Amino acid sequence: MDEMSEYGQLVPEHIRNLGGYTPGKSRRQAQQESRVSCIKMASNENPFGPSPKAITAMQAVLAETNFYPDNDTSQLRQKLAELYRVQPEQVVPTAGSTALLGIIARTLLTPGLNAITSERSFIVYPIATQAAGGKLIRTPLRDDGYDLDAIAAAIDRNTRIIYLSNPNNPTGTMVSAAEVDRFLNKVPDHVVVILDEAYCDFAQYFAAQRGVDYSHGLDYVRQGRKVVVLRTFSKAHGLAGVRAGYGIGPVELMSYFARMRTTFSVSSVAQAAALAALEDEAHARKAIINNAVQAPLLADGIAEMGYRVVPTWTNFLYCESNDDAAVVAERLQEAGIIIRPLGPWGAPTAIRITIGTPEQNQVFLKAFKKVMERAAVR
């Protein structure tokens, strides 16, 4: 065995063994590599960009960025509390909801304790859990989504957290409100359920179309249950680049999370953008409606080529390419399309495609057809 390095000896084993997060490629990186203009359909961003009101609000605070931001995010907390009919003390904004996942894990887990989620779910869950010294238990998928019965059966006396990405990233599947209701009745008092609703805006619209009840997450919080709902401004609101998200949960628990938050972590620019975005529902709705119209068209276009597409409740599609996803992604990038190969999720032939504008989706379908008609890429 190799001798441990000087600095490795200083770092706890669970940190030494920690795998980092690898994001989807930026347009700049992809364009430098491929030397072609690229459309990014990899990271589930809003293809219409941020609200003009959010842009104006961000510009207005730039001249004051020599001052620290409001550490308590008072205005944003108050606005979200009014919107969701909870107390301001129940709301904790962070620099994206992923930051709160790390805070939750560090607050509730220590070595010897565990968290539970599903296989092929949000890739930050294992990172946050391991960084806190905890163990992540992953149960098998059922029909490309969460098997809530399996998760309930996996709970033991050392379980403290259950992560439910609903809808799930990267498969795009959803568990209904009725299913979550039944599941919560099986969860013991020593476990906190994290309902990660990053894609809730799209799911709510699809659910209304399809006659399904999506989520009672905020009702659980209002009832005082051990549930924390996570949401973000990165998706429908188009603010992924400024990092703004939040959690809503029980007052006492959220107070611990607030203490764990890095000082001044939500910038003045992010707070201004988030507040303005909440005032421009029409902009978010434009993205949501475009997504609802385009999702079946894009899915059908891919399916007509003979590839399996999982029905989505989100702003992306999970597709089985039947070939090496990394090579498919590389060839699409050469054609000017950035998508996400899902090998890191344990799906070496699967790809994730953000649903774009009508024009972007047509460009993707043409490029995908051309790429997949080439010799097998296995």
Q: What is each residue range found by the language model?
A:
Residues 130, 148-158, 170-193, 197-236:
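Active-site pre-lysine segment of PLP-dependent enzymes
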Residues 331-335, 340, 344-378:
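PLP-dependent enzyme catalytic core of the Aspartate aminotransferase-like
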Residues 87-91, 112-114, 158, 190, ...:
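Short acidic capping loops at alpha-helix termini that bridge into adjacent secondary structure
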Residues 141, 292, 301-335, 351:
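Conserved PLP-binding catalytic core of the aspartate aminotransferase-like
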Residues 69-114:
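Phosphate-binding glycine-rich loop
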Residues 51, 72, 226-310:
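PLP-dependent aminotransferase class I/II
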